[in-house]
């Protein structure tokens, strides 16, 4: 493995962008997921993520030398603006933007946990009993608190280490609660929160690449669709529709 340089970083960005474009164009359809499953998508995303976070040239890689395109691009980027190379300015902007995005992202996580701790966990006996039955059905021993959040538009699960389920502040039937808890618990058991978290880090670092945002949407949509398939595969048509 050779040290990172401008050439290896450019190759890393080019390879990753082509892979992300391929994933978004060919792998986001429901037909693809049904035929190949979600593992193929997550494996490809994992390869892209590792490559994006390791911008080095590896000894086992087959490197193709560029005698025209790369030299032309680097000569173009080495034009000086007020005695500073344009490439240096770009690197500073990209690094500053990445650090700022990472800082803001973790600040939002800390602020969110702080706001959550100001709420009291749900103590409704009926809701807790239904949730306890679902936990037992899924053989899940993790302690997961439930919060009712005013103004929340839809149920969600949050938290990587200490997950919590968030419910909008309204009335629910027993059947609604069962489906909500099964849906959110499946996200936790299949590590969907971790998948999204790691890709959020990639988005923070590659904030300037629009394809990273498109793959973030792909990961979320894939997780939701796979979850729906798991919950409805053994249900009758009326239940699936509901």
Where are the predicted features?
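Membrane-embedded and juxtamembrane structural elements of multi-pass membrane proteins
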Residues: 2-63, 81, 85-242
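Membrane-interfacial helical/loop segments at transmembrane boundaries in membrane proteins
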Residues: 65-80
């Amino acid at each position: 493995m050779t040290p990172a340089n401008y050439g290896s970083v450019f190759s890393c960005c080019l390879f990753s962008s082509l892979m992300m474009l391929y994933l978004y164009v060919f792998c986001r359809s429901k037909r693809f997921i049904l035929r190949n499953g979600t593992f193929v998508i997550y494996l490809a995303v994992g390869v892209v993520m590792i490559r994006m976070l390791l911008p080095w040239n590896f000894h086992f890689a087959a490197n193709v030398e560029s005698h025209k395109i790369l030299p032309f691009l680097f000569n173009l980027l080495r034009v000086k603006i007020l005695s500073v190379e344009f490439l240096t300015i770009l690197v500073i902007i990209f690094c500053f933007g990445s650090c700022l995005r990472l800082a803001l992202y973790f600040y939002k996580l800390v602020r969110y946990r702080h706001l959550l701790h100001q709420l009291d966990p749900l103590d409704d006996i009926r809701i807790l009993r239904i949730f306890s039955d679902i936990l037992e059905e899924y053989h899940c021993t993790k302690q997961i608190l439930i919060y009712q959040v005013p103004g929340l538009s839809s149920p969600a699960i949050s938290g990587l280490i200490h997950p919590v389920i968030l419910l909008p502040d309204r009335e629910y039937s027993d059947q609604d609660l069962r489906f909500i808890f099964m849906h959110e618990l499946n996200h936790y058991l299949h590590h969907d929160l971790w998948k999204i978290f790691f890709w959020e880090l990639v988005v923070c670092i590659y904030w300037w690449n629009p394809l990273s945002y498109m793959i973030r949407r792909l990961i979320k949509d894939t997780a939701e669709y796979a979850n729906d398939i798991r919950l409805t595969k053994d249900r009758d048509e009326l239940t699936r529709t509901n």
